[in-house]
Amino acid sequence: MLDENEKLVSLPVSHRDHRTDGYLEKAASIVGLERLHFDTGAQLLEINSIFQLLAIVDNTPDELVRAKYLQLMPDLIMHALTGEIGTEYTIATTTGLYDTQENQWAYGLAKDLGIPMHFFGEVEDAGSIRGVLSEDIQAKTGLGPLRCIATTSHDTASAVVATPLESPGSAYISSGTWSLMGVEIDSPITNEITLHERLTNEGGFDRSIRLLRNITGLWIIQEVRRDLKSQGIEINYVDLVAAAKAQSDPWRTLFFVDAPVFVYAGGMIARIQQYARETGQPVPETPGEIAQATFASLALQYAHTADVLAECSGLAMPAIHIVGGGAQNEHLSQMTADVSNKEVITGPIEATAIGNAIVQAITTGAIADIGSARALISSSDMKFGTYQPTTDSSAREQIKAVRNRYEELIAHQRVTD
C-alpha cells in the first residue's frame, strides 16, 4: 500500500507469512464460505489478498488509515518504473475481492468484512499502456521514454497465453512451485462443486476466464531437497527424479498435496512421514521413496482436478498441456498421462516470459491476436514433449485401484481442511 505521497506504508510481506493463519475461518464466520466464493468466484486460500487485508485490519489498522493506493506486486513494480498508479485485471482477480461476474471490486463483501475500499482503483485490461519509463529510470539506465505495458501480470495468466491449446477444451498445468491447473472459459462458473473442490475463476487475456485450481506443486520437492541438504545429503533434481523412478512400488505412499501442513517452509520430510503414519501408510524413509510419494500424489491430484474441471465446464478435455519448469520432469509427465488417461503435451518451459512478451507484441501490433501467437509457438523450434497413457490392461487396473484409494484418502479434505 502507498500513502498520499506514493511511498510505501510498510514493506510487502510474503504470501506464505503466518499472519493470515485462521483468517479464512474468521471471514467465513462473518459472511459464510459460500459468499466468499460466490461473490468473487475465487478459491478460498489464506494466502489471498482478502485475508492479508483482514490481518492488517486486526493487527496494524493504522496502515489502512495512511494508505491511499493499493498496488498489487506487479502494479507496484510498474509504479517504480513509471510513477503511474494502476491495477491490472488478471492480478486483481486473484485477490478474493474482485467480482468476476460483474467485473468490478466486490464492495459489498469488503464492507461486511470491515475492509476499507478507498484505496482500490479502477481496473484496466491486460495489454494497457500504463505509461513510459520515468525520467529517473531513463537517466539511470540510459534508455529513452519506452512505453510500459501492463501485461497479463499474474504469472499464470501469462503462461496460459503461451500455452498452445490446439485441441478445444484441453487443460493446462503451469507447473512450478505451484501447479495451477485449469481450462479457458468465457464466463465464470460458481457452484457447490467449485466451492468444495477449491476452484477459482481468474482473469485471462482479453477478459477471458481461467477456471482453475491452485495445487501445491514442486514447492514440496524443493523443500524435500532443502531438508536433505540440511541432513548433509546433497542430491540434484535429476538424481532425485531418477531415485523416485527406480522405486518398485510407485504408489506405496500417497498424500494430499494441498493439506495446509505442506504450505509452509521447513521440516517437509517429517510432515510427509507424519501424514503417512496418521493415514496408516508405509512411512517413506529414503530420498527416492519420499520423492516418489510426492510425484505420485501430484499426478493423482492432477487427475482428480482434471475430472472436476471437466464436470464443471462440460469440456471434453482431450489433452493436458504442462508448461513451466515442471514440464522438464518427464517422470511426472508420464505418471500424469497414465493416471489421467489423457495425452500430456509439455512445453514451452519459459511460458510465463513468452506469454508476457506476446501480450506486449499484440498491444504494439507485432502479432495479430492470441491465436496467431499460439500457432507461432507451435510451429517454433521450442522443445515440446508428448506422453501417451499406458494401454497395458494390468497397469490400467492397478491405476484404477490407486485412484480409488486416493479418492478415499482425500474425500474428507474440502475447503477449510
Task: Label each PLM-derived region with a short phrase.
Residues 17, 131-134:
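Short, glycine/charge-rich flexible loops or terminal/linker lids adjacent to PRPP-binding catalytic cores
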Residues 1, 22-26, 159-161:
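Pocket-flanking alpha-helical
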Residues 1-15, 43-47, 78-99, 122-125:
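Short beta-strand-loop/turn "lid" adjacent to the catalytic site in phosphate-handling enzymes
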Residues 13-30, 358:
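Short alpha-helix plus adjacent loop in nuclease-associated cores
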Residues 101-102, 126-130:
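Short beta-strand to alpha-helix junction loop
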Residues 107, 113-126, 357:
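A conserved helix-loop-beta module that forms one wall/lid of the active-site cleft
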